[in-house]
């Protein structure tokens, strides 16, 4: 009878741990999607380097661009 309780406890805690990691992994994926939606191009602080004044913030790249169109294309 005591052996049965230990097995039940082991199964319970294993499932609890599995649920925790599944929820944690799902939360990270959702954060990545939300981060992509928050991307934007902004004018950087003067002076501009090589006439590139637009910066991508929160997107795929952190480079500088000379036009807003270039920045938007690379950032999103």
Curated annotation (Swiss-Prot):
Residues 1-27 form the signal peptide. The keyword Signal applies. Expressed exclusively in endosperm. Disulfide bonds join 53-75. Keywords: Disulfide bond, Signal. Transmembrane segments: none annotated. It comes from the Eukaryota. Belongs to the MEG family. This is Protein MATERNALLY EXPRESSED GENE 4. It comes from Zea mays (Maize).
């Amino acid at each position: 009878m005591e052996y049965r309780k230990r097995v039940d406890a082991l199964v319970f805690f294993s499932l609890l741990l599995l649920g925790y990691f599944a929820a944690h992994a799902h939360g990270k994926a959702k954060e990545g999607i939300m981060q992509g939606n928050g991307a934007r191009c902004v004018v950087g602080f003067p002076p501009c380097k090589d006439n590139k004044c637009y910066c991508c913030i929160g997107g795929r790249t952190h480079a500088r661009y000379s036009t807003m169109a270039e920045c938007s294309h690379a950032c999103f």
